[in-house]
Amino acid sequence: MAKQQDQVDKIRENLDNSTVKSISLANELERSFMEYAMSVIVARALPDARDGLKPVHRRVLYGAYIGGMHHDRPFKKSARIVGDVMSKFHPHGDMAIYDTMSRMAQDFSLRYLLIDGHGNFGSIDGDRPAAQRYTEARLSKLAAELLKDIDKDTVDFIANYDGEEKEPTVLPAAFPNLLANGSSGIAVGMSTSIPSHNLSELIAGLIMLIDNPQCTFQELLTVIKGPDFPTGANIIYTKGIESYFETGKGNVVIRSKVEIEQLQTRSALVVTEIPYMVNKTTLIEKIVELVKAEEISGIADIRDESSREGIRLVIEVKRDTVPEVLLNQLFKSTRLQVRFPVNMLALVKGAPVLLNMKQALEVYLDHQIDVLVRKTKFVLNKQQERYHILSGLLIAALNIDEVVAIIKKSANNQEAINTLNTKFKLDEIQAKAVLDMRLRSLSVLEVNKLQTEQKELKDSIEFCKKVLADQKLQLKIIKEELQKINDQFGDERRSEILYDISEEIDDESLIKVENVVITMSTNGYLKRIGVDAYNLQHRGGVGVKGLTTYVDDSISQLLVCSTHSDLLFFTDKGKVYRIRAHQIPYGFRTNKGIPAVNLIKIEKDERICSLLSVNNYDDGYFFFCTKNGIVKRTSLNEFINILSNGKRAISFDDNDTLYSVIKTHGNDEIFIGSTNGFVVRFHENQLRVLSRTARGVFGISLNKGEFVNGLSTSSNGSLLLSVGQNGIGKLTSIDKYRLTKRNAKGVKTLRVTDRTGPVVTTTTVFGNEDLLMISSAGKIVRTSLQELSEQGKNTSGVKLIRLKDNERLERVTIFKEELEDKEMQLEDVGSKQITQ
């Protein structure tokens, strides 16, 4: 017991005499955490605003520099660089150093490479670099500009971790690396995310700032267009770009570069560039996952055809899918489109500062001024030292006999130095230089060289003094140096900036506005084709296999419109349905198309009789005509809310069907033709405007068994084209047809015979259009109406198309090409021939 008490007393005595202090745990935690946080911020996660480098990047570059791994020297093993950096400057894991070095050698990670790598340094698919013992590296040519003049006291050096080496606190950085290559990092309580930019644009921005220090971020935006990422892709110009230029924070929307290609049997989305920091393999896996989960439909196949030439990701589209709509879904659901958050946080004088674009350029510019001043002072000191020595050498050369005598008489060097000082006022440095001078330097030629060198040094010294005294001259020199960098390393943008495109994705925002041909077969198969799919042929041409159809099917409708036009489908039952033109999948001339029932909710026994396009509902009318001659006029704006499920467009008797619908302007003359070759002409204002669901009135008087087979207006031309089923047709001036009241019998226009066959269509034209004729076999002949001579009434006409046995002319379409605005217009002038 006594022994234990002695031990307790001894412990108390030791505690009383110890240096242990009582402290607050909360205070100690706060202090330790702040030390750790600042260490991470300053020494690990954030780049210096002056050279754009974190300590580990700077150490790798400087380690390669002092190791002689320059761009014009042979490659050396990566392990050599990693080992040197780890042993001298960065006492951390070798993989951290190697990963840093590898990233600076990856063209998909850095916009401007700082390491010239030889071997496998990873891929955009997420493949890791080969082991450091296999790969080789050296500094890139551009990296040498970061280290340029580092041996001329341009930056401060500090001791390394063990005090045996010196390392730079910042690099001279002859180009704005922070903005050129960007940076990203996560510190404690803060992070940085700086996008890369185009070097040429940055230099233009710096020159603008030098010339006009008061320039605004809007003015900088005129030369620095926005980010320029290593992987290219498209950048959608949004307020986010302006925001980070002004405040240092914002969002950049990056969208993959995708082209729609036509393969042999279907369309394909071909991805050639993807957003920065997107893993291609992960992207493909995500698309496959969405297809399996049935969240995205319409993809037939996906394959990666990427090579050394670049990315090529092919996504084959199913035949019944609109490629633009599928692309829209992929942009929404995958990383084909991403947002890059910009937070331009960097170290300024050792503290983290959020910089806007102008401030980042100003910090770099201040650094360049500091580098130039320090370099100039260093050069000035060296030149002044050399000038001082040259002055002594020239004195000695001019008094060489006395100098030689003094040296010969002197007992030692110090006595010679003292004598030279006394005799010629040479200080110790000059005297030592004289003693070290070789005899050959005493020749006349060498003396002249010394005099020339002295004169050049004098001029250079004066220039250095001017530079140090004149900031304008400093800025001029910096501009010249930046221009040299631009001339040598400047390049074109990789990322294209898209203006006037919304970042909000909708189907039509991705669909190019272009003119297309819309076709529909008798059985209701729809197809969208390019307007250049048909070649002009002369009258009587046999045609090409223009529009393939299924067996027992033929073409019934064809028109040209914009991809952004509304398409209105009018059916024989008097209903109307509406979709957008781009909703019809793109196809080839020889494709069969897709059923209309896939796009509109048409009934099984319902047939589409007219297909019209509308861009503006504010002006104009729809003019309806039934098979039995009932007509009606209704304003376009009554059809603006029509959807794909359809609505009633006209009412009529049970034994009647809707024949055709055309657009009118309110002051047109209407021409209605019959199967027996009669035409009635009357003014549309004879009909009052009726509601959408109203019934009409009689427009033409028909005999029993006679039906309407033509509907057109005077605004479509001054000639009347009449075409028979056997390919016989003619042109007649509309002046030959008198203006009558509606519901008249009309005037005979085509003499119907066995040679002509029943009249297929009667329509007005100008005479300078192209005529597209579609046969029952799906062949198309395009010929100019200018080749067709004008004839009188009640004649049979001439041969327009050569038809084979059992082949008949089924549809006629007029094709207009407006040369002034390059827009293609097409007037749908006929309907499928009435079966006799």
UniProtKB/Swiss-Prot annotation:
Gene Ontology cellular component terms for the protein in this record: chromosome; cytoplasm; DNA topoisomerase type II (double strand cut, ATP-hydrolyzing) complex
Q: What is its EC number?
A: 5.6.2.2
Q: Name one Pfam family in it.
A: DNA_gyraseA_C
Query: Which residues span the membrane?
Result: none
Q: Catalytic center at which residues?
A: 134
* Keywords for the protein's UniProt record, in alphabetical order: ATP-binding, Cytoplasm, DNA-binding, Isomerase, Nucleotide-binding, Topoisomerase
Q: Its catalytic activity?
A: ATP-dependent breakage, passage and rejoining of double-stranded DNA
Q: Where is the protein found, in the record's own terms? A: Cytoplasm
Q: Which SUPFAM superfamilies match?
A: GyrA/ParC C-terminal domain-like, Type II DNA topoisomerase
Q: List the disulfide bonds.
A: none
Primary location class:
cytoplasm
Checking InterPro entries in the record gives: GyrA, GyrA/parC_rep, Gyrase/topoIV_suA_C, Topo_IIA-like_dom_sf, Topo_IIA_A/C_ab, Topo_IIA_A_a_sf, Topo_IIA_dom_A, Type_II_DNA_Topoisomerases
Name the family.
Belongs to the type II topoisomerase GyrA/ParC subunit family.
Q: What is the stated purpose of this protein?
A: A type II topoisomerase that negatively supercoils closed circular double-stranded (ds) DNA in an ATP-dependent manner to modulate DNA topology and maintain chromosomes in an underwound state. Negative supercoiling favors strand separation, and DNA replication, transcription, recombination and repair, all of which involve strand separation. Also able to catalyze the interconversion of other topological isomers of dsDNA rings, including catenanes and knotted rings. Type II topoisomerases break and join 2 DNA strands simultaneously in an ATP-dependent manner.
Complexes and interactors: Heterotetramer, composed of two GyrA and two GyrB chains. In the heterotetramer, GyrA contains the active site tyrosine that forms a transient covalent intermediate with DNA, while GyrB binds cofactors and catalyzes ATP hydrolysis.
Other remarks on this protein: Few gyrases are as efficient as E.coli at forming negative supercoils. Not all organisms have 2 type II topoisomerases; in organisms with a single type II topoisomerase this enzyme also has to decatenate newly replicated chromosomes.
HAMAP family, per the entry:
GyrA
Q: What is this protein called?
A: DNA gyrase subunit A
Q: Which organism is it from?
A: Mycoplasma genitalium (strain ATCC 33530 / DSM 19775 / NCTC 10195 / G37) (Mycoplasmoides genitalium)
